[in-house]
UniProtKB/Swiss-Prot annotation:
This is Succinyl-diaminopimelate desuccinylase. Binds 2 Zn(2+) or Co(2+) ions per subunit. It catalyses: N-succinyl-(2S,6S)-2,6-diaminopimelate + H2O = (2S,6S)-2,6-diaminopimelate + succinate. The gene is dapE. It holds the Pfam family M20_dimer. Zn(2+) 1 binds at residues 70, 103, 166.
Length: 379
């Protein structure tokens, strides 16, 4: 069994359902400390975070390449639906099964072993290797990576490159990497009306009827055209509720939850202003509460993307696709202190599902790609 596969199984065997790390980071710390890393545990409200650094011969003047990832996993779902226990690694038909196999314990193991091989081959490496690991990525993500980034900002610590080990591939290892993510902003809209008997509409004010024209306009709006890296911004309703449940009562208010997934072609302030303008144009009496869970970030083609593309092509023969599709990730926090952030990991077809798995044939090539990137950028 390869070193990467063995470490992956060791991590899967820890039932680290968010935010419980279950000593996964301790396993990693023991390996990294033996390599000469300085490891710091940063705890916050039940969340375990790890910041580990190994300086190269250039010291703080050298380039810093960080690997960011998470040890927490999503809940298993109904255990009886699993073909084998989710926290007992199992091999079937060339696949390794277990919760976290794809998201993202294989990536964690791969970068640890890649670092071990890199340091052994390049003991005098010039640049710095770092790990930023959290147990709060699958949960609220309020005490994990964002807290470590805030601490690093306060210390004046910088990163030059960061690989986030998210499972970005689709069918083959390396067919897709993420060089950015859209921003996410939600709104809670309450449109006020006047409750009354449905037989006497002149004595009431129906908020559903008032909202409908504005809702149609919001749904039809072209928010932007996207750009080279991002598709156009989207606006979607996730929840719409009004009424008491009775068939003879005009409701007193209508509640609408909606979400923007927005590109770098739009801003938070600009989108909010346009929504308010549409609501105001229709004369609505309303309250609107905004929440921004992440800003868009983008890493244009450059050193990190080039090194990763070269490594993937050398290892797999695949020409990778740079993409910004999908949901948010911890990359949105890291982009605040790192100009080049790219996500790359194994295929994601089984993540968060019953019988999550990874094809064993991808495990060591993933490690090799990570090692090749280290060799290109900080050797």
């Amino acid at each position: 069994m390869s070193a990467t596969l063995a470490l992956t199984e060791q991590l899967i065997a820890r039932a680290s359902v968010t935010p419980d790390d279950q000593h996964c980071q301790q396993i990693m710390t023991e390996r990294l400390t033996a390599l000469g890393f300085e490891c710091e545990t940063i705890a916050s409200h039940g969340v375990t975070n790890l910041w580990a650094v190994k300086r190269g011969t250039d010291g703080r003047d050298g380039k810093l390449l960080a690997f960011a990832g998470h040890t927490d996993v999503v809940p298993t779902g109904p255990l009886e639906q699993w073909s084998s226990p989710p926290f007992i690694p199992a091999h079937r038909d060339g696949k390794l099964y277990g919760r976290g196999a794809a998201d993202m314990k294989t990536s964690l193991a791969a970068f640890v072993v890649a670092s071990e091989e890199f340091v052994a081959a390049h003991p005098g490496h010039r640049g710095t290797i770092a790990f930023l690991i959290t147990s709060d990525e699958e949960g609220p993500a309020t005490d994990g990576t964002v807290k470590v980034v805030e601490l690093l900002e306060a210390r004046g610590e910088r990163m030059d490159y960061c690989i986030v080990g998210e499972p970005t591939s689709t069918t083959e290892l390396g067919d897709v990497v993420k060089n950015g993510r859209r921003g996410s902003m939600s709104g809670e809209l309450v449109v006020k009306g006047v409750q009354g008997h449905i037989a006497y509409p002149h004595l009431a004010k129906n908020p559903i009827h008032l909202l409908a024209p504005a809702l149609a306009e919001l749904a039809a709006e072209q928010w932007d055209e996207g750009n080279e890296y991002f598709p156009p911004t989207t606006w979607q309703v996730s929840n719409l509720h009004a009424g008491t449940g009775a068939s003879n009562v005009i409701p007193g208010h209508a509640d609408l939850l909606f979400n923007f997934r927005f590109s770098t072609a739009s801003t938070v302030e600009g989108l909010q202003a346009r929504v308010h303008a549409i609501l105001d144009k229709h004369g609505l009496e309303y309250t609107l509460k905004w929440s921004v869970s992440g800003l868009p970030f983008l890493t244009p083609r450059g050193e990190l993307s080039g090194a990763l593309e070269n490594a993937i092509r050398t290892e797999t023969g695949i020409t990778t696709e740079l993409s910004t599709t999908g949901g948010t990730s911890d990359g949105r926090f890291i982009a605040r202190i790192c100009p080049q952030v790219i996500e790359f990991g194994p295929p994601n077809g089984s993540i968060h599902k019953i019988d999550e798995h990874i094809e064993v044939r991808f495990v060591d090539p993933l490690k090799n790609v990570y090692r090749r990137v280290l060799e290109q950028l900080i050797a």
